[in-house]
């Protein structure tokens, strides 16, 4: 596993916010990942679908960013630092904290001293938040 400070037990957690940093260029990426995939399956003879929860590929996950994954293949995974920033207990908390981290770090505009982009993020998710959602967010 390549994650720094991974949780030992993920059963009661929903997901995490992460930062991946290229040690060669100093560029980073801020993203999110769920610990489990949850699907509803139809079962023969039953009216309602059954919820199936299984652990995701989070231990070996690198990113959904095509550019970042290309860089990892080119430079080797050992040249990247994978840090878990926050653990979350709900989808709302996961979405909120990812957006908050991306806005606070100004991932779309921040530059390194040499003028290159500091973050590889190309967008910030458009997620609707309201006071009710923000009040429900609890830090783990």
Question: Which stretches of residues belong to each language-model region?
Answer:
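Boundary/linker segments flanking structured domains
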Residues: 1-11, 86-140
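GIY-YIG nuclease catalytic motif and its immediate N-terminal context
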Residues: 1-42, 136-140
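Generic hydrophobic, helix-prone segments enriched in Leu/Val/Ile
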Residues: 14-16, 72, 120
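Generic alpha-helical secondary structure signal
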Residues: 22, 33, 62-65, 123, ...
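Conserved short loop/helix modules at catalytic or binding sites
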Residues: 34-91
């Amino acid at each position: 596993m390549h994650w720094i400070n991974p949780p030992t037990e993920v059963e009661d957690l929903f997901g995490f916010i992460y930062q991946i940093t290229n040690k060669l260029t100093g560029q980073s990426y801020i993203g999110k990942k769920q610990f489990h995939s949850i699907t509803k399956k139809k079962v023969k003879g039953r009216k309602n679908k059954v919820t199936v929860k299984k652990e995701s590929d989070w231990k070996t996950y690198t990113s959904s960013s095509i550019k970042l994954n290309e860089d990892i293949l080119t430079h080797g995974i050992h040249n990247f630092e994978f840090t878990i920033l926050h653990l979350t207990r709900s989808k709302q908390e996961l979405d909120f904290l990812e957006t908050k981290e991306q806005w606070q770090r100004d991932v779309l505009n921040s530059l390194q001293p040499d003028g290159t982009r500091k973050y590889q993020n190309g967008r910030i998710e458009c997620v609707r938040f309201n006071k009710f959602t923000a009040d429900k967010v609890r830090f783990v």
